[in-house]
Amino acid sequence: MEGGGGGGSLPPFLSKTYEMVDDPSTDAVVGWTPAGTSFVVANQPEFCRDLLPKYFKHNNFSSFVRQLNTYGFRKVDPEQWEFANEDFIKGQRHRLKNIHRRKPIFSHSSHSQGAGPLTDNERKDYEEEIERLKSDNAALSSELQNNTLKKLNMEKRMQALEEKLFVVEDQQRSLISYVREIVKAPGFLSSFVQQQDHHRKKRRLPIPISFHEDANTQENQIMPCDLTNSPAQTFYRESFDKMESSLNSLENFLREASEEFGNDISYDDGVPGPSSTVVLTELHSPGESDPRVSSPPTRMRTSSAGAGDSHSSRDVAESTSCAESPPIPQMHSRVDTRAKVSEIDVNSEPAVTETGPSRDQPAEEPPAVTPGANDGFWQQFLTEQPGSSDAHQEAQSERRDGGNKVDEMKSGDRQHLWWGKRNVEQITEKLGLLTSTEKT
């Protein structure tokens, strides 16, 4: 390494280093400082490539630095490779003989020969340090292994995410192409608008038309439907008004007929007149009384052979004196009528055939009538039950047709009006038959 040649007393490394630094042709790579007390390696790569192989048969800059340290050279500037020695000065080659090679403080031979065995404390310290280094090494190894596993898992997740991303991109492309084809199809826009209009419409359930709807029916409806201005509502309202006017006309007719029958008709035979009043009392319910006409309850007395004009006049006076009495309910009126009709003996011959004078006709003696001429008529009329089967069937059919649309009060009033109409027709027919019989 140090090479041969040069002065016999000088080490070859020192002589070759001095020649290399003192050569002016190598000042660009290595040379003296301006003071001449040190040298600087300016270009380390070229120094290793060109000068070290030429002078020292190697190109290792570290080995060159170690040799300098062996001969007592030191580094002057930490920013650059500048070395100095007290006897290595420019122009003073003769001072190189004062530079000697330093011997190492600890050599393998001297350590093996002169060093004694380690003490227990030193051995213990070394062992503890070794164990600490082993534990640190194990911790670092486990951490490295965990980091390696995490890295592998992260790589797998990244790969899965990339695959999902590719799938989503493919689906998006297919969806866009499909939508583009649908939009390009003819008639798509019109059908789409029709579907939107169809979905905007609200479904309404048909509501049965009823004049009297209770609260439960309105609450159970799913969809409200306003029929205030509909043609069906107008039609049913007109029909209802017509029917109501017809019923009012019929009611007025019945009241007028009751007035005529109660005031103008007198009977020549012994059958008492208030029997017609009994029928008319049943025709008028307590809630339908007219303020113009009062239908007082008639007190019927049993005709006997000893009854005379005093009985008839007394009955008329009692019937007129009861004008302020309250009306009898429908059910009680029917029961009382049947009870009182059963007490009348239609086949009995009255002792006195004269009746009290009416308000419109003067009092005169009626012609004698053969007893029993109208007994069959009056027996059939008086024994007939007010709620006949025909009237009852008609009322039931009327209620079935109405269903739940009309409440119980309206159904009862309608049944009462139909029953009254039928009885008035029967009264009219039988009065006509009576008139023809009397004429004959």
Swiss-Prot record:
SMART domains: HSF. SUPFAM superfamilies: Winged helix' DNA-binding domain. Signal peptide: none annotated. Residues 121-181 form a coiled coil. Disulfide bonds: none annotated. Exhibits temperature-dependent phosphorylation. Residues 295-305, 380-390 have a biased composition (Polar residues). It is found in: Cytoplasm; Nucleus. Residues 133-183 are annotated as: Hydrophobic repeat HR-A/B. Keywords: Coiled coil, Cytoplasm, DNA-binding, Nucleus, Phosphoprotein, Stress response, Transcription, Transcription regulation. Pfam families: HSF_DNA-bind. Residues 264-417 are annotated as: Disordered. Gene3D superfamilies: Winged helix-like DNA-binding domain superfamily/Winged helix DNA-binding domain. A motif (Nuclear localization signal) lies at residues 200-204. One of its GO terms (biological process) is regulation of transcription by RNA polymerase II. PROSITE patterns: HSF_DOMAIN. The keyword Magnesium does not apply. The keyword Phosphoprotein applies. A motif (Nuclear export signal) lies at residues 158-163. GO terms for cellular component: cytoplasm; nucleus. The hydrophobic-rich region (HR-A/B) corresponds to the oligomerization domain. AHA motifs are transcriptional activator elements. Belongs to the HSF family. Class A subfamily. Transcriptional regulator that specifically binds DNA of heat shock promoter elements (HSE). This is Heat stress transcription factor A-4b. The gene is HSFA4B.
